[in-house]
Amino acid sequence: MLGPLVAVGSRFGIVGILVVVGLYFGGQFLFSGGGAGTSVGLSDQREQAGAARSPDDAASFVGFVLDDAQNTWRKKFAQMGKQYQPAKLVLFTDRTSTGCGFGSAAMGPFYCPADERVFIDLGFFDELSRRFGAPGDFAQAYVIAHEIGHHVQHTLGLDRAKRAAGASSEGPTGASVRLELQADCFAGIWAHSSEQRQLLEAGDIDEALAAAAAVGDDRLQRQGGGAVNPESWTHGSAEQRARWFRKGFSSGDFAACDTASGPL
């Protein structure tokens, strides 16, 4: 998931039981995919991503970014001699059932490894802009690419450490933070690919960096009125999240996203 649940509680108001469900089933909350390809360009999708966009336009934008990110990873996997199996996208309102248990809009976008699907309530993007101060279509694109990053981790078996650690995966250097920062880095790799194809506009990367920082554990804990407690972190600090996204964007290299060991 893109952002941490504040103090193992509720970064978006999610009740404690949902945190437990997420830890038990391995769901990646807060920010997943695949559908038919589209010939519509990103510039066309941007026109639909404005404040007055309809639900259909918003769904079209999410689907486009999801497919484009998955096409990027399909090529990356081929370079590694592997086959990429795309995730599926589920758009829902308020609540839904998943292979990882009950899903709620309060959890934000999330990826469920049990059914290899990304779940998004489109209302989250309004919250991302208004509550978290991260507006813009590329802020939204970062969220989607982050969730696909979790699917990449699951496909490659990189999420096994968190499943093995269970609740003990929390903390500033825990398995949960390492996986989330890697997903941020993977989102940066997709952004790098977009830049190489001349799809980015001025300010896009700034929007993504702002979104990454907005959902840092420390910033969310302060926003919730509590003290910053690194031992309860599940996603990393605002600085870490932005830095790892930038690392993926700057390099475009899978190897640059190794968060399994070493300093974060």
Which positions does each model-derived feature cover?
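Pan-zinc metallopeptidase signature
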Residues: 215-264
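Long amphipathic alpha-helical segments used for membrane anchoring, targeting, substrate engagement
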Residues: 1-49
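Catalytic Zn2+-binding segment of zinc metalloproteases
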Residues: 148-163, 192-195
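Short pre-active-site segment immediately N-terminal to the catalytic Zn-binding motif
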Residues: 124-142, 171-177
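Catalytic zinc-binding patch centered on the HExxH motif and its immediate surroundings
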Residues: 37, 95-121
